[in-house]
Amino acid sequence: MTEKEKMLAEKWYDANFDQDLINERARAKDICFELNHTKPSDKNKRKELIDELFQTTTDNVSISIPFDTDYGWNVKLGKNVYVNTNCYFMDGGQITIGDNVFIGPNCGFYTATHPLNFHHRNEGFEKAGPINIGSNTWFGGHVAVLPGVTIGEGSVIGAGSVVTKDIPPHSLAVGNPCKVVRKIDNEVPSEALNDETLN
């Protein structure tokens, strides 16, 4: 198996010294650099760079700068996704994000883990686990999502949370480690939006 194949199979792989992976990361970093230095008002150029980075035709995806990712092609984005400023997608493992997802500033989605034994760690070994984000979710600022986590549809993750385990759908979850506080009523509202119906 190539190191890339090992990475995608969630096996230990050489993350630091494999030239093919180094080249793929360099490609993504160059595109991120260009995106981060493109005027926010130049929407056509930004759309072109975002599609090139993720190697797909995105549908109403908005990314505030600065933004960083390792590969880009291993991020699967739904439609109507908003990524606020200074977010990082560590996409050695696949990151799947559903439709209508709001991601606050300074959020990180970290698919990689390293050996605890520093001898192995110093040899460049790494393992990547997927992250799955359901549609209609919202992340407050400074949220960290760790490898192997699934966050269910319609959930809200409070600012500063560190998500180490799965979060069920329609949950309000906060903290370090992130825990469910209560369920969210995501039924279609029968009343007009006001201070009472917002909670």
UniProtKB/Swiss-Prot annotation:
Its EC number is 2.3.1.-. SMART domains: Mac (SM01266). SUPFAM superfamilies: Trimeric LpxA-like enzymes. InterPro entries: Hexapep, LacA-like, Mac_dom, Trimer_LpxA-like_sf. It comes from the Bacteria. Keywords: Acyltransferase, Repeat, Transferase. One of its GO terms (molecular function) is galactoside O-acetyltransferase activity. It is an enzyme of class 2 (transferase). Transmembrane segments: none annotated. The keyword Transferase applies. Pfam families: Hexapep (PF00132), Hexapep_2 (PF14602), Mac (PF12464). Belongs to the transferase hexapeptide repeat family. This is Putative acetyltransferase SAR2635. It comes from Staphylococcus aureus (strain MRSA252). The lineage of its organism: Bacteria, Bacillati, Bacillota, Bacilli, Bacillales.
